[in-house]
Amino acid sequence: MKLILTQEVPGLGSPGDIVEVANGYGRNYLVPRKYAILATKGAERQVEQIKRARSARAVRDLGHAQEIAGQLGGLKVELISRAGKEGRLFGSVTAADVVEAVTAAGGPELDRRRVELTTPIKSLGAYTVAVHLHPEVTASVKLQVKKA
């Protein structure tokens, strides 16, 4: 069965991709959940138009992402959190906490889903946090976690 994906499907593809799947998978899972539509000639032409517009937008987004990466490059962010005597935090620092601290430090607004915490931040100290702004642009933010 030939389908056009309307949403990101792990292991299958991204929106706009034309994929070949088993009939049951397409009919019983992808189409009812609106992850995909049937691949007709009209739908394929529409997808091609959308892909052309998306590629033009990607060029603009790349420039914007590089601009934001430049702003984040020299930014030092302090995060105040409650901690015990040994420096262990009560809870852990989340991506939303990092975004809030970056905004408070005068940095640009970020999407919390773009912030990657490789290891959970559960103690005081200095950390480097990666921010994926674009598939080709990743910025790093220096984060200092201090005791409240």
From Swiss-Prot:
GO molecular function: rRNA binding; structural constituent of ribosome
InterPro entries (alphabetical): Ribosomal_bL9, Ribosomal_bL9/RNase_H1_N, Ribosomal_bL9_bac/chp, Ribosomal_bL9_C, Ribosomal_bL9_C_sf, Ribosomal_bL9_N, Ribosomal_bL9_N_sf
Name recorded for this polypeptide: Large ribosomal subunit protein bL9
Entry keywords, A to Z: Ribonucleoprotein, Ribosomal protein, RNA-binding, rRNA-binding
Cross-referenced NCBIfam families: L9
Similarity comment: Belongs to the bacterial ribosomal protein bL9 family.
Gene Ontology CC annotation, any one: ribosome
Role, per record: Binds to the 23S rRNA.
Organism in which the protein naturally occurs: Frankia alni (strain DSM 45986 / CECT 9034 / ACN14a)
UniProt GO BP: translation
